[in-house]
Amino acid sequence: MFNLHGKETQNQIDPFHHFMLIKTYQQEFDWLNPWNKKDVVTRSGVASVVKTGKGKLMLLTSADLVANATLIEARRKNASLPSRMHLNRIDHALNLALLESSEKSFFEGLKALEWEIAEKGEAELPVLNPGQKKPFQGEITRLTVGHRQVRDTWLPILQLSLKEIPPQGSIVIQKQKAVGMVLNGSQGNHNVLPLQLVKGFLTNGTGIEQTGLAHRGFQWKSFSQPSLAGFAKIPENLEGVWVSRVLPYGTGSEVLNVGDYLTHIGKWELSREGQIEHSKWGNVLFDALFLEDLEPGQEVELSLYRKGKRLKLTTKVGIYQENGNRVPMKIFEKPPRYLIRGGLVFQELTVNYLEVWGQNWQNRAPLRLRLFKQLDRSRIEKFSKLKNLKNQDQERIVILSQVLPDAVNIGYQELRNLVVKRANGRKVIHLESLVEALKQPQTGLHRIEFLPGSERVQVVLPVVELAKADARIKNNFQIPRFQSL
């Protein structure tokens, strides 16, 4: 039970020594009109006092709560005014963020949380409301694996049964020790990031989006019909999973092939559902091994069947990395990249832009754009065995997103979402290449070609008229700058 009067005993802790409310003012960029920002949205949640690997006190909260925030405020108990906090580190794969204060006295009287590994059983969450004298009571029921779509990560997650809906960033307590942080959920069931992942973030990360997260290096499917065993040249009724895709990072990515039938990771046997028998949590997806059984850099043996032959391959536990897609995952804290010439607005295709069509963009966005996101999967598969992906990672899909009406672009003003192929005869692989191509017009004209299937094959702009046209457009649409790279 929590004592709200500042006194802490062996069996109870004062939440105001360890937690505080924060308020954020988030302002996302407008990816449809990339020179603008959207309206400010305020959000509230909880931050916890933690000690980093260097021994410094900071506040821990969720990345979702502080992403794209122009202002972050934390209010200590009895403080007349909130204190401004600054983002020190953020990890969107884990949904964690660290905040620091420029006030030297901010952390005086505060205490860092003590942590412990979670177990099945009763749990509680602190309440920072003077009218609520008791913490929320819940129960950790099991360990499962969740998918963090914003970064395509698979994470071991604790399931918390709780009637109330806690604030974002709330910490789960067992035996007066922190065991994890609430990520999301609905009334009755919540996902909790376990201690092991939180501690890894506190001690290993060194900057923005710096994850040392042990992670799988492949996607898999199960054989739903035993009759497929003959087709795959594996023994009938053999437990295991079929490798359907190899990632360019993570455990097994350097040795596995598409079509391999994986039966063991180390000493753990895989079921047809991808589960292992965990000594503490019972049947759970094999990703749970990356919580504490398998650490980054550790050698592990993979047992599998490949084209009918049984193999044992040794590899090292790999970590999650940004995957170098031509259509990048959701971008935070960075403005959109764009270029405007003659009213033609060029952007690089991103998930942020696709989300202009809403959360269901996979079905609502233009098909030609969605296909490039799907094609990224086969591209990753193709290049996953290459040692140097640096040059490949720089490639992007450049689109003509819209046309700002002006006399110079009459006839083109209804064009939307066309994929740029070439400009002035030069291949366009990112916005920088488009900028360079537009420095070399052909016979006084800029010729921009699009991929087949578009409403137009090409557009033509007269070079001599562009300077005056750009000045008119800049004034008419109040655009601060025509280029952001």
Kindly give the residue locations of the regions a language model identified.
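Catalytic-center loop of serine/cysteine hydrolases
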Residues: 106, 187-192
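Conserved, short, structured surface segments that act as functional micro-motifs
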Residues: 136-143, 190-204, 437-438
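Boundary at the C-terminal end of the N-terminal hydrophobic targeting segment
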Residues: 6-11
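Soluble extramembrane regions of membrane proteins in the secretory/endomembrane system
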Residues: 149-153
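A short, Trp-centered hydrophobic/proline-enriched beta-strand micro-motif
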Residues: 14-34, 123-127
